[in-house]
C-alpha cells in the first residue's frame, strides 16, 4: 500500500527499508537528529534568557513535518518516540543548566524539566490540532512567555 501511494514498486521500497516499521524508525531518527543538531548549536545562555530563539527554530521543523509529528505525538502516538525526544532535550538542558548554574539539588531541575517539556509537547499538540493558526514565531514567543512567566501570562489576558 505504501509503495502504491509513493508510486514506487515494492522492490524499490524493500531496497531501502526492511519493512514499514523500519521506514517509521528511520523517519523518527531523522526528526530526532534534526532536533538534536538544532539544540546543539544554541548556547546555554539561550535556555535562560531567550528560549524563543530555540522555539523559533523548533516550530518550523514541526510545521514542515506536521503530518508525521501529529501521528507521533498525537492521541495514539508513539510513546517510545516521545520518550526519546524528552531524553534528547533533557540531556541538552541539564548539560547547559549545570554549566550555567550548578544545582545542589537535582530534584528541582527534574521537576521543572518534567513540567516544561510536557507543556511544550502539549503546546505542539495544541498547535497542530488547532490548525497551526499562530505563526511559528508567535508560538515561540508564547512558549517563551509561559516558560519565563508561568501563570502570570493569563493575568495579563484577564479583563
What are these regions (language model features)?
Residues 1-22:
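Helix-turn-helix
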Residues 5, 22-42, 53, 57-60, ...:
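Alpha-helical structural segments
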Residues 26, 30, 87, 91, ...:
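Short, residue-level hotspots on alpha-helical faces of the histone-fold
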Residues 27, 34-38, 65, 69, ...:
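A short secondary-structure junction motif
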Residues 34-42, 119-130:
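Solvent-exposed, amphipathic alpha-helical segments
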Residues 48-63, 67, 114, 118, ...:
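Amphipathic alpha-helical segments that line or abut small-molecule/effector binding pockets
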Residues 76-102, 107-121:
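Amphipathic alpha-helical packing segments from all-alpha helical-bundle domains
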Residues 118, 126-159:
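C-terminal peripheral helix-coil segments that are non-catalytic and often amphipathic
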